[in-house]
Structures are given as C-alpha cells and as structure tokens.
Swiss-Prot record:
Disulfide bonds: none annotated. The gene is menD. Belongs to the TPP enzyme family. MenD subfamily. This is 2-succinyl-5-enolpyruvyl-6-hydroxy-3-cyclohexene-1-carboxylate synthase. One of its GO terms (biological process) is menaquinone biosynthetic process. It comes from Yersinia pestis (strain Pestoides F). Binds 1 thiamine pyrophosphate per subunit. Homodimer. Pathway: Quinol/quinone metabolism; 1,4-dihydroxy-2-naphthoate biosynthesis; 1,4-dihydroxy-2-naphthoate from chorismate: step 2/7; Quinol/quinone metabolism; menaquinone biosynthesis.
Length: 567
C-alpha cells in the first residue's frame, strides 16, 4: 500500500474539515514536503488558492485576507526555515485577532535531530504566540478518520482570536501511487463528505471574563456625567455607530486614524498639547475607550495621565490593552454589541471649546502647508485621493502618525493596518491580501523603507482584481527617528539609514505602472486616472528627508500658542 496515497487522503480530510469552519482562502508556498496539503487544497472546490514564493510575505498575505474578510485563512508551507518565516504574521495576528491556520509540513519524527536535510524542531517553534497548537502524528491508517476530523473540529471551535498552528509530519514517498487505495478509510465518515457541517459541532462556553456583555448596571448613572470617548482601532460600521452614539451623549470623541469615526475633532495630536484643552479634559468624570492601538503621541500621553472617576475599555480582543493600567473596567466584547446594549441619552455637549481648539489647529495646518508638496501635505489631503467605495491601507512609522495628526478620513471608510506589533515587515503583502479579500479599489500608503523591506511582495500586486495604487512616500530612510531624541551625530547612519533609491525599476521588474509626480495637482490627477484605468500603479513621492517630522514638531508648538477659548 502507498504511503503517498494515504498522505493525500489524510491531507484531503484535513482541508475539508477546515472548510466546514469557514476557511475559504488558503495561501500556499512552494515545497515538496507540503505536497499532500498543496494537492488537497488544489483539489478542493471550496478553497481559493493564493500562491507566493516568499513565506514571510505569504503569512502577511494571509493576514490581510483575514483582516478584510473577517474569516479564518489557512497557510501551507514546507518544512524547515519556511516555517520560521511565518513568525511575524503570526505575532501580528495574535495581537490584532485575525484567525490564521498555519499548516506546516514537517519531516516525520525519525528524521528529527539526526542530520536529515531541511528537518528542524517545529513542534513548539512559535512558543506562546499561537492561540492553539496541534501536533498531528505521522499519517497512518491505524488512526481513524474520525479521530483526525474530531481533533480539527475541536481546535477550530476554540479558535476565536489569533492563530492555530497545525504541524503536519509526512513520510516519503510523497508522489504517485494508486488513488483508489485507502478509499475505505475516507469512506468511514459516510455522508459527511456530502454534508456542509463539521463532524463534531463543539460549543465552547468561555470563562466568565469573556461572557457576552450584560448591560453595566450603573450605565444609566454614568451616562449622565461628563465623559470623554477615545476611539481606537475598530471596524467601519462600529466607527459610524460610535460617532452617532457619542454625539447623542454630548461627549467629545477623540478618534484615532484607524477608528473610522471620521475624527469629529481632527488634529487631536496637535490640540491635545494645548494646556487649556488639557484642563477641559481633566473635568471628565468618565473616560470610555473603544478599541486599542492608539497612534497619537499626545493622545497616549493624555490617556496615561488622565484620572477620571471611571475608566472603561471596550474591545473584543482579550487582554488588558491599557498600558497605563487604569483602575476601572475591561469589557471584552464587540464594540457594536456593547453600544447597542448601552443606549445613549441625548444631552447638551459639555466640552464645546474642544471643537474650537480643533478648528484652530486644522486652520493652522492648512495655513502652514499651503502650496507645499510634502510628506505632511500628502498626509493632510489624503482623503482627496481615496477611491469611491474603496478602502485604505496605512503603513507604519512616520506616515501613519502624520495622517493621524494632520488628516481627517471619512466616517465609515474602511481603513486597515498592521498596528498590533507595528512592524514594517510585510506591509505590502498585507495590503495585497486586503485587496484580494474584498476586490475593492485600494489605496495603500507606506514609507520607502517599508516598501524596500517587502519589495518582492510587488509580485502579489500584479493581478489585482480592482484598481490599486501603492503610494510610496520616499523620505530616504526611517525618518520616524527624527521625532525621537536619538543622538544627532549617529542618527542618519544608525537610525534613519538612508538608502538613496527610487522605485521605478522595481515597478518595471514586476510589470506595474509607475509615476513620480512633482506637485499635488499632478498627484491627485494621477491617482484619479488610476481608479479609472485599473491595474496596480506604484506612485513614488520623493520628499526632503526630515521635513515631515520637522513640520509635525513645528505645528505642535504653534498650536500650543493658540489663544484660550472661552468655555
């Protein structure tokens, strides 16, 4: 009897079991040891297969697919260092909640620790970062199909957040054999193969910390007080819902760039530095934070220092999510569900002077950036580039801070990012996954080092299903470090690390469109044409290295001098 055939039977059951739990997309890297899994995925009509030659990018592609689809996404890689390349995406998923199923092919146990090629210790490789781990045995007909499918169903039922690592050892041979062999092993599951449900329908009742949110008994008391709403990362519908809810209460809403609330008080990173604005906020009796991953330095400083009578943090992700460790309540549930259970009561706004500080800060930004074609100016006017019925992917480091501080995105407009661990690795790959999951026109904006870090992911952008623009802000290095008190003598060499590159040849190498505009009207027209033309275009905006950081620092200083507004 053929080992290769039974390997494929085993893998086919594994993949079919995953589809019963909503897995629709699967990302595959090349490799021989993963052959049973790859062939099973290719043969399964319920799966959409995505391929990439770089496992690090592949993991981030899956991450982007999971972000935008809100579905679990599977990944197949071969044994050895291919597995380790999934680590960054796995870490990000653990922090931001996307469900990834990492199917890592492995050598059988007898080939580990004996000098066999491409054999490493894969069990436990990811330490505590996966939410769950399953180490499957080497496939053998002595193990029933019922055991395998039940094991997978149990693991998938428990996976509510983060990644599931399934290590899959396969012995050789991996190819050939009579496909009719071992049919009885698969047939032992009867009509399950024609069904659409899991073999084992396991219901997980979570511990009390994760129970669906009962209404906070004292909410009717606290909603009559002076409150402040902080909006972190959340979905588009949640952002719209929260904006209306806070407006009904008359509570000021300070929205992060990822909140999708429309940022009713824009330029918060600037006006929060004003001492009078801080005095107003200090009168809040309650602070309610929805979502995490706050971007603004000034907002984080105020969030750390504030001392309300009550501090509540609502987010569906587990964990404390409050680096300041406030005394209060950590409510683990979806933002929209919590808002529905805790209705607002129409009240007169209590901190109206904050709107005046916000308007003054925005006016200062407009005046300072008038006529400029700079990193800060692009961040400020970014909303003008967004496609209708599209989406935005925002990179990390300086650009996301500038957009947060100087821009104002439309309420409910989908915004995606990797702000869990906030790394610059895999940003282009993640953006590619976001676009593939939704098939929407997509604007992605990153810095030059981020683009260089994930340059081979340009291969993933060649076949976009809707128009896509990759906007690379080339400030020649990691200029985020210009905002930090890094030693000036060593800053360029050891922190910013300028590379003196342009991206024209990279775009040509991967058959992408390319443009390098020299003015804001030219950039705006180019982007507009891209939405009409289709395909993927890399647009490079070359800017002076430290101008963006210097402009932000200058504006913060200017806004602190705005005259006091009468309450």
């Amino acid at each position: 009897m053929s080992t290769s055939v039974f390997n494929r039977r085993w893998a086919a059951l594994l993949l079919e079991a995953l589809t019963r739990h909503g897995v629709r997309h699967i990302c595959i890297a090349p490799g021989s040891r993963s052959t049973p899994l790859t062939l099973a995925a290719a043969a399964n009509p319920s799966l959409v297969c995505h391929t990439h030659f770089d496992e690090r990018g592949l993991g981030h592609l899956a991450l982007g697919l999971a972000k935008a689809s809100t579905e679990p996404v599977a990944v197949i890689v071969t044994s050895g260092t291919a597995v380790a390349n999934l680590y960054p995406a796995l870490i990000e998923a653990g922090l931001t909640g996307e469900r990834l199923i990492l199917l890592t092919a492995d050598r059988p146990p007898e080939l580990i620790d004996c000098g066999a090629n491409q054999a490493i210790r894969q069990q436990g490789l990811f330490a505590s970062h996966p939410t769950l781990s399953v180490n499957l045995p080497r496939p053998t007909p002595d193990i029933s199909a019922r055991w395998l499918v039940s094991t997978l169903d149990s693991a998938m039922a428990q996976l509510q957040h983060g990644a599931l690592h399934i290590n899959c050892p396969f012995a050789e041979p991996l190819y050939g054999g009579d496909e009719q062999q071992y049919a009885d092993w698969s047939a032992s599951l009867g009509d399950w193969w024609q069904d659409c449900h899991p073999w084992l329908r396991q219901t997980c009742y979570p511990p009390s910390l994760y129970q669906p949110p009962a209404q906070q008994a004292d909410w009717f008391f606290w909603r009559q007080k002076r409150g402040v709403v902080i909006a972190g990362r959340m979905g588009a519908q949640e952002g719209r819902q929260l904006t209306a809810w806070a407006a009904m209460l008359g509570w000021p809403l300070i929205g992060d760039v990822l909140s999708q609330t429309g940022q009713p008080l824009p330029c918060a990173d600037l006006w929060l530095a004003h001492p009078r604005a801080q005095e107003t906020l200090a009168q809040a009796q309650m602070v309610l934070q929805f979502g995490s991953s706050l971007t603004s330095k000034r907002l984080l400083q105020w969030q750390t220092a504030c001392q309300p009578q009550e501090y509540w943090l609502v987010d569906s992700a587990p964990g404390r999510l409050d680096p300041a460790n406030h005394r209060g309540r950590r409510i683990i549930c979806p933002v929209g569900e919590w808002l529905s259970r805790h209705p607002a009561q129409r009240r007169t706004p209590w901190a109206t002077e904050l709107a005046a500080y916000s308007e003054s800060a925005q006016a200062q930004v407009i005046e300072t950036l008038a006529g400029q074609f700079s990193e800060a100016a692009v961040a400020h006017q970014l909303a003008e580039l967004l496609p209708d019925n599209g989406q935005l992917f925002v990179g990390n480091s300086l650009i996301v801070r500038l957009i947060d501080a100087l821009g104002q995105l439309p309420a409910g407009y989908p915004v995606y990012s990797n702000r869990g661990a906030s790394g610059i690795d895999g940003l282009l790959s993640t953006a590619a996954g976001v676009q593939r999951a939704t098939a929407k026109p997509t604007l992605a904006i990153v810095g030059d080092l981020s683009a260089l870090y994930d340059l081979n992911a340009l291969a993933l952008l060649r076949q976009s299903s809707a128009p896509m623009v990759l906007l690379v802000i080339n400030n020649n290095g990691g200029q985020i470090f210009s905002l930090l008190p890094t030693p000036e003598a060593e800053r360029q060499r050891f922190y910013c690390m300028p590379q003196d590159v342009n991206f024209e040849h990279a775009a040509v190498m991967f058959s992408l469109g390319y443009a390098r505009p020299n003015s804001w009207p030219q950039l705006r027209e180019l982007v507009h044409q891209c939405w009409l033309r289709g395909g993927t275009t890399l647009i490079e905006v070359q800017v002076p290295p430290s101008q963006g950081a210097e402009t932000l620092q200058q504006l913060v200083q200017q806004v602190t001098l705005i005259p006091q507004v009468a309450p």
